[in-house]
Amino acid sequence: MSAVVIGDPRDELVTPGSPGQFGQGGDATAHASMLGGIPVADLPHHELLLGQRSGAIGSVHSWELVTAVDGPGTRMTTFLAGCPLRCLYCHNPDTMNANRGLPVRADDLLARIKRYRSIFRATGGGITLSGGEVLQQPAFARRILRGAKKLGIHTAIDTSGFLGRNADDAMLADVDLVLLDVKAGDEATYQRVTGRRLQPTLDFGRRLDALGTETWIRFVLVPGLTDDAATVEKVADYAASLSCVSRVEVLPFHQMGRDKWAELGLDYQLDDTEPPSAELVESTRTIFRSRGLTTY
C-alpha cells in the first residue's frame, strides 16, 4: 500500500476546531480550502442550508489520494462529515459530527476530481466517497457520483449501509463498487459495536444484490468483541448469500484513532484491546474462504 495524503484537515480542508453550527469553528471561518471551502462568514445561513438540501454544498472532513486501500487502483477518497453509528473502534471519531466538516461546493470537488483522471486511468482507480457515513449526505453524494460518471471515472462508496434507504436507485446506478462494512453478524454484537441495529445493513446488501452492484464486504476483527466464531460465521454466511460480493476484506483492529478519542473528550472503551494475532486473522479469513469467498 502507498498513500499520498493531500487533503490534510489542518490546511487544505480545514477541520473546525470545535463543533457548532455547520462548518463553524477553528480556521474554517477564516480560510477557504483548496477544494473551494466556503468561509461561513461569507455565506448567509439560509444559503448554506439551501445548498446542503440541494446537494450543491457538502460537509467535508478531508480527502486523500491513496493506493490499494479504498477500492482498486489509485483513488481520491473524500471523507464526508457526519455518521449515525458510534463504532467502538472508529479510527476517525472526528468525522462523526457533521458540524465538524468544512462546507465544500460539489462543483469545486468535481473540479479537483477531474484533475486526477489521468492517474485514475493509468492505475484503474477512481473516487471513493467515505466518511463518516456517505449516505448521511445523499444529495451531495448523488451530485458527486453523477459528475464523476460523466467524467468517465470509476466510483465507489464506503458505507455501513445503515442509511441505505437514503440511496435511491438513480444514485446507485452511478456507483460502480460498494465497500459494505458489516460490523458483526448478530444483533447483540452489532448493537454493542455501533449502538445501532443490524437489519438495515443486511437489507441494503440484499438490495445491492438485486441491483447487481459489485460489492466488497469489510469486516473489522476485534479480539474480545467481533472475533467469536459464531458471529464471524454469520457474517461469512451472509456474504456468501450475495452473488454481488466479489471480495471480502478482514481488517485487523488497531488503535490508530485512540488519540483522537482523547482529544475529543470521548471514552475509548478499547484502550486495553490488543490487535489480533496473525493466527487469529488467518483463521478468520479461512472461515470466509471456506464459503468460496475471495478473502484478504
Model feature map: region roles:
Residues 16-28, 40-46, 53-55, 75, ...:
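Generic detector of short, locally flexible boundary/turn motifs and exposed helical patches
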Residues 55, 62-104:
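Canonical Radical SAM [4Fe-4S] cluster-binding loop centered on the CxxxCxxC motif
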Residues 110, 114-263:
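Conserved AdoMet/S-adenosylmethionine-binding subsite of the radical SAM
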Residues 1-67, 223-296:
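Auxiliary Fe-S-binding modules of radical SAM enzymes
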Residues 94-98, 191-197, 265-273:
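Short glycine-enriched, charge-decorated loop/helix-capping segments at active-site entrances
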Residues 103, 195-198, 275-278:
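Short, conserved loop/turn and helix-capping segments at secondary-structure boundaries
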Residues 52-53, 69-71, 121, 171-172:
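Solvent-exposed alpha-helices and their adjacent loops that cap or buttress functional pockets
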